[in-house]
A protein has these predicted regions:
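Walker A (P-loop) phosphate-binding motif
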Residues: 2-30, 36
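Short beta-strand-centered segment that lines the nucleotide-binding/catalytic pocket of NTP-utilizing
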Residues: 34-49, 121-127
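C-terminal lobe/tail of nucleotide-utilizing enzymes
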Residues: 207-250
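Short "domain-exit" segments at the C-terminal end of structured domains
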Residues: 251-255
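Iron-sulfur cluster-binding cysteine motifs and their immediate structural context
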Residues: 79-97, 108-124
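Switch II (G3) loop of P-loop NTPases
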Residues: 41-42, 140-179
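N-terminal glycine-rich dinucleotide-binding loop that anchors FAD/FMN and/or NAD(P) in oxidoreductases
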Residues: 53-71
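Inter-motif core of Ras-like GTPase G domains
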Residues: 176-198, 203
Length: 255
């Protein structure tokens, strides 16, 4: 493997063993002499550091810009409401009401305000921890309690550890916005699944996402001895590389 590589480990559902695989893969590459970074992008429930003897050295608070209106000079024209695709500004009796939890920090309202009475303030969205554990550089995000949108924090987290030869992204489960943001810019992805009807259904959704993002990917089946053969048949029918099938063992469970 030449050059710097970003590998995303993802899954259509939680509990498939995605984080275990991410940590194991990071440890294997580190043992081969590579400078490896593990980025825990599951910022709502980060737990990758629990598998490492992590020495956290840096904790940084992350902010995102949200609009604020100078109401004394606002004319109530409604341009800000019209330009916002996320309904983060609504006009009530010709006065704009900002809904910060709906805001995607695009800056459209600021740039389009004809009176220039909208400006941005910084809103805390979470923290990012950076440290070292088991010869692996670790960075993980933790979303602030009550903060509804994870993608801005994930985007900030992915700016860490660029000096590593290999960056492994432990993506959040599912196929919603946090998972999509985690997958972006990856050179390849590994989708972890289990051989059950629910596992196959959610795998198909995850496959749709990585194909839409045009990311090369393969499948790992975890606990391959507890279900049926439907995932294997799906991979064959869709011409998807099956990278590994791992049986459920008491040795793995003990870890």
């Amino acid at each position: 493997m030449e050059g710097k590589v970003q590998i995303a480990i993802a899954s259509g559902k939680g509990g498939t063993g995605k984080t275990t695989l991410a940590v194991t893969l990071a440890a294997r590459y580190a043992a081969s002499g590579k400078l490896v970074a593990l980025l825990d992008c599951d910022v709502e429930e980060p737990n990758a550091n629990l598998f490492l003897k992590t020495d956290i050295r840096i904790t940084e608070t992350i902010y995102t810009p949200v609009p604020r209106v100078d109401e004394d000079n606002c004319t109530g024209c409604g341009k800000c409401e019209d330009v916002c695709n996320f309904n983060a500004i609504v006009l009530i009796k010709e006065r704009p009401l900002v809904l910060p939890d709906m805001c995607h920090s695009c800056g459209g309202c600021v740039s389009e305000c004809p009176e220039k009475v909208i400006y941005e303030v910084q809103k805390e969205i979470g923290t990012i921890e950076e440290g070292y554990g088991d010869s692996i550089v670790y960075a993980g995000g933790r979303l602030k309690i009550g903060q509804p949108m994870a993608p801005p924090l994930i985007k900030a987290l992915k700016n860490y550890c660029f000096s590593a030869d290999i960056r492994i992204i432990d993506a959040p489960p599912g196929t919603s916005c946090p998972a999509v943001e985690s997958l972006r810019e990856s050179d390849c992805a590994i989708l972890v699944t289990e051989p059950t009807p629910f596992g196959l259904n959610d795998l198909k959704l995850a496959v749709g996402v990585v194909r839409r993002l045009d990311i090369p990917f393969g499948i790992v089946i975890n606990r391959s001895d507890i279900g049926d053969n439907s995932v294997v048949e799906y991979c064959l029918a869709e011409n998807i590389p099956l990278l590994r099938s791992e049986e459920h063992t008491s040795e793995l469970q003990s870890h």
